[in-house]
């Protein structure tokens, strides 16, 4: 395992890449409504990213099980946990939830963040899933502090979600991030406090709870990218890129503009 600590200048560049991801998600928030296809959202995202001098890192991302990822964002609707491929057939419906995962490469550094959106008015059951998953993200971030361990992040996420009866997907994890989208270490969403790598200041990691309304079991669709819940129940996914600091983590990505556009939905 090779973990790269970042300089302050490098963290500054990562902050810029991640802020662009936040702005891209906000731009998409303006267009998420019933009748819109996920392919339309992908085209909006790619144009926005490129217009701001960056490259969408997901496009062409290699897959050990099949071909490279064909789009600029992942659009995961309802029972899709992650890696949903934008297409013209998936039309958003009133009451859907959609997780949009977005990555950028700007000035040699990567940004990565995900947000689960409501399409129109959604059920209270789905709102509670989203609320809990987002809370779990911030529980994890509270533990991304120098001197603690990766297991402290993982345990905080797991305990918060499982206490409310939700499933934590175990096959998928967060990750280190920097020049590359996926660097060491992996950041699981389950674990034991005090276990795992000790966190050091200037480590940069993506923390991303992937939480299911039902059981945690998943399956890989025939496109070799789309991962769904095995029981067909909805899933939510929130992600921030953070810099480990002494005392308190620094969140490099941002949901601020998204939440201003969305208002208080849940």
Please give the residue ranges for each predicted region.
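Active-site neighborhoods and metal-handling regions in enzymes and metal-associated proteins
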Residues: 1-266
């Amino acid at each position: 395992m090779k973990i790269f600590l970042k300089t302050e200048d490098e963290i500054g560049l990562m902050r810029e890449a991640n802020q662009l991801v936040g702005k891209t998600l906000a731009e998409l928030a303006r267009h998420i409504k019933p009748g819109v296809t996920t392919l339309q959202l992908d085209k909006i995202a790619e144009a926005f990213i490129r217009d701001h001098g960056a490259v969408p890192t997901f496009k062409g991302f290699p897959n050990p099980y099949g071909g490279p990822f064909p789009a600029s964002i992942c659009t995961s609707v309802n029972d899709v946990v992650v890696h949903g491929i934008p297409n013209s057939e998936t039309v958003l419906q009133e009451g859907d939830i959609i997780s949009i995962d977005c990555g950028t490469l700007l000035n040699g550094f990567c940004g990565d963040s995900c947000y689960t959106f409501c399409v129109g008015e959604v059920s209270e059951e789905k709102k509670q899933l989203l609320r809990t998953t987002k809370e779990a993200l911030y529980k994890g971030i509270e533990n991304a502090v120098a001197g603690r361990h990766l297991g402290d992040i993982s345990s905080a996420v797991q305990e918060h979600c499982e206490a409310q009866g939700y499933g934590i997907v175990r096959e998928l994890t967060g990750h280190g991030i920097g020049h590359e989208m996926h660097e060491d270490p992996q950041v699981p969403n389950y674990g034991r406090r005090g276990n795992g790598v000790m966190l050091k200041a200037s480590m940069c990691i993506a923390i991303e709870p992937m939480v299911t309304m039902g059981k945690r079991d998943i399956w890989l669709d025939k496109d070799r990218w789309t991962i769904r819940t095995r029981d067909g129940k909805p899933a939510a996914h929130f992600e921030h890129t953070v810099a480990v600091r002494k005392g308190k983590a620094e969140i490099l990505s941002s949901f601020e503009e998204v939440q201003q556009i969305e208002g208080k939905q849940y």
